[in-house]
Amino acid sequence: MRPPPFPKPAHPEEALALQRALAKKVRLAGSLEGVRRIAALDASHKRGRPLVAVALLYDLEKGPLHVATALLPEEALFPYVPGLLSFREAPAYLEALAALPEAPEALLVDGQGVAHPRGLGIASHLGVHLDLPSVGVAKRLLYGRPEAPLPEEKGAAVRLLAPDGRPLGYVYRSRTGVKPLYVSPGHRVGLEEALRFVRRLPTRFRLPEPLRLAHLEAGRALKALD
């Protein structure tokens, strides 16, 4: 695939303005029924090293098909600013996606979708930029609060609510007794559909298998730079 050029803001204030504008383009409607090939995205970075981004092409029936890795030099990275992570990681993700042998039908991203202070986490940002359905699966809570306590058993889910009560996604227990995940739609996916899709994915550990494999690849690639 050939992603369109990604704008690089000159400073955080410009990034904030762009983020607010792009958030208005997010569509929280759509189905992932019938989607078969997705790209799972994960990134890893250590001070003094390039940022490593991995795009793993995954067939929901056959498993992993292809892994593409991109390195972005540290000096080329957008400054680290909480809530603006997508401007730091997205250029490397787009480079990795461009190296895949075929375009995915949807994106599964390690990070937030609309569960973000301005409604545009990395999954939403990439989804809008590429006009692809996208789902964010985060390991940590960035924004919002659980509607109720989350049961310990596998498959349990409670809604994640914004401070004003709007639903943002779900707090989801992928395995009994493990820490929860925070699932939110990115773009062209409804809230319930995002959770439904993540529940469909094979999950042997805490992370859905496509994201777990992408995470392992990113870690290996970063370690190889030492």
Swiss-Prot record:
Gene3D superfamilies: archaeoglobus fulgidus dsm 4304 superfamily (3.30.2170.10). GO terms for molecular function: deoxyribonuclease V activity; magnesium ion binding; RNA endonuclease activity, producing 5'-phosphomonoesters; single-stranded RNA binding. Keywords: Cytoplasm, DNA damage, DNA repair, Endonuclease, Hydrolase, Magnesium, Metal-binding, Nuclease. It is found in: Cytoplasm. It catalyses: Endonucleolytic cleavage at apurinic or apyrimidinic sites to products with a 5'-phosphate. GO terms for cellular component: cytoplasm. Coiled coil: none annotated. GO terms for biological process: DNA repair. Its EC number is 3.1.21.7. Pfam families: Endonuclease_5 (PF04493). Its cofactor is Mg(2+). The record marks 80 as: Interaction with target DNA. The keyword Cytoplasm applies. InterPro entries: Endonuclease-V. It comes from the Bacteria. Mg(2+) binds at residues 42, 110. Belongs to the endonuclease V family. PANTHER family: ENDONUCLEASE V (PTHR28511:SF1). DNA repair enzyme involved in the repair of deaminated bases. Selectively cleaves double-stranded DNA at the second phosphodiester bond 3' to a deoxyinosine leaving behind the intact lesion on the nicked DNA. This is Endonuclease V. The lineage of its organism: Bacteria, Thermotogati, Deinococcota, Deinococci, Thermales.
